[in-house]
Regions:
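Divalent-cation-assisted or electrostatically stabilized phosphate/pyrophosphate-binding catalytic cores
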Residues: 94-97, 103
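Hydrophobic alpha-helical transmembrane segments
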Residues: 2-73, 88-90, 102-126
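Active-site His/Glu-centered metal-binding helix of metallohydrolases
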Residues: 73-80, 98
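Amphipathic, hydrophobic secondary-structure cores in small proteins
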Residues: 79-91
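Residue-level signal for inorganic ion chemistry
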Residues: 23, 78, 95
């Protein structure tokens, strides 16, 4: 049995194009992805406004990147489950609920980090 892949490797630029297409699809079709996007823009504007530190920037960028990545994974899991079965199945529900739960946990962490970073700046204004 030949284990070598006979297909031509996909050029790097094509891989990048597929990834961008996935992100754009999620932004167009997923309400929560749009909410995360708008929230991220607001957070970035606040970050510039308050001139946060380099360390705070690292946390903000990791939180934003992680949120987008996790939402994309959640969306992919939902799509695969929908592809596998159109009928209700408790395991399909669990898979979707688990993925959504992971996003919720990370979103709560993101909010907590946002409060820790921005609350002192906001309180300093008053």
């Amino acid at each position: 049995m030949d284990l070598q892949d006979k297909r031509k490797p996909i050029p790097f630029i094509s891989s990048f194009s597929f990834a961008v297409s996935g992100i754009m699809t999620a932004l167009k079709t997923e309400r929560n992805m749009r909410i995360h996007f708008i929230s991220s823009v607001i957070v970035l504007v606040l970050s510039f406004y308050f001139s946060i530190t380099k360390m705070e920037w690292l946390f903000i960028l990791f939180v934003i990147g992680g949120m987008f990545a996790l939402e994309l994974i959640n969306t992919a899991i939902e799509r695969v489950v929908d592809l596998v079965t159109v009928e209700y199945h408790p395991l399909a529900k669990q898979a979707k609920d688990l993925a959504a739960g992971a996003v919720l946990v990370y979103a709560a962490l993101a909010v907590a980090i946002g409060i820790v970073i921005f609350l002192p700046y906001a309180l300093h204004m008053f």
